[in-house]
């Protein structure tokens, strides 16, 4: 089961070596993208997948698929920020997930 924005500021438990996927909506055509601000005790990959849209339509959004893997036992944490890389702002949206790795 994938995690979504509904899981923001929650804690999950996974086994060492187990993968979990976080799916967050975004639209990089606006200049904003989900970036990993910090990641402790976990490995991660981020991939953007655009939503299907009619030919010739620009500016469609999509979903960011962030895969995390428990690499060390103990408490891990990932913080993602939805921002324009060239203009960080204190009001940028964040997604934080604590992960207990067993």
UniProtKB/Swiss-Prot annotation:
Sites marked Important for the redox regulation of cysteine protease inhibitory activity possibly by regulating oligomeric state: 39, 58, 60
Motif extent (BC loop): 27-32
Record carries keyword Cytoplasm: yes
Record-annotated membrane-spanning stretches: none
Reported impact of residue 29 to S: Increases inhibitory activity towards model target papain
PTM: During oxidative conditions, cys-39, cys-58 and cys-60 react to form intra- and inter-molecular disulfide bonds resulting in the loss of the protein inhibitory activity.
Compartments in which it is found: Cytoplasm
Gene ablation phenotype (knockout): RNAi-mediated knockdown causes an increase in peptidolytic activity.
UniProt family annotation: Belongs to the protease inhibitor I42 family.
Oligomeric and partner information: Monomer. During oxidative conditions, forms homooligomers; disulfide-linked. Interacts with cysteine protease CP2. Interacts with cysteine protease CP5.
Protein known as: Amoebiasin-1
Gene name of the record: ICP1
């Amino acid at each position: 089961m994938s995690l979504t924005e509904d899981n923001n500021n929650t804690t999950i438990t996974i086994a060492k070596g187990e993968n979990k996927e976080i799916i967050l909506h975004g639209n990089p055509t606006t200049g904003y993208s989900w970036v990993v601000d910090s990641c402790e005790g976990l490995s991660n990959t981020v991939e953007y997948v655009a939503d299907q849209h009619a030919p010739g339509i620009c500016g469609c959004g999509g979903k960011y698929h962030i895969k995390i893997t428990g690499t060390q036992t103990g408490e891990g944490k990932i913080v993602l920020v939805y921002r324009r890389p060239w203009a960080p702002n204190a009001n940028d949206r964040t997604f934080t997930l604590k992960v207990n790795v067993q």
